């Protein structure tokens, strides 16, 4: 679960100051990685249980991943449309957009509510909320934490990078 949270920090950092097109591309590619890691079991189901050859199973799974990644791309467009250059935007708008896209993904076209971000933290201190508010709302809570912690982490990374550069110059 720590990698899922770290990946959200990276996504927030990459989307800062981007336009709608760039946000779509970044979020879409994030979605490809997200789904590629999370639903590799679909390939196994298609290939072994569906008795379909390896190449066809791979292509079907890849098409499925690209279709699901469109939701993340839509998230990027929605976030870039509603956000403004502020920490409040990251804390408020980012979680709302993420939650709306997860709800949409769970409803539209008979839904595919798998890999909800809220279920990744079921074994953490936030896991107790899972049974009370559900996975989708727990995702929003997780994204609020990610949005709130993102600026301090980004500024720390800048300080670390500058320190490395300074150290390199001194050497």
Residue ranges, per PLM feature:
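Membrane-embedded alpha-helical bundles of multi-pass enzymes
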Residues: 1-152, 171
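Low-acidity, Ser/Thr- and Arg-rich intrinsically disordered low-complexity segments
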Residues: 150, 155-156, 161-163, 168
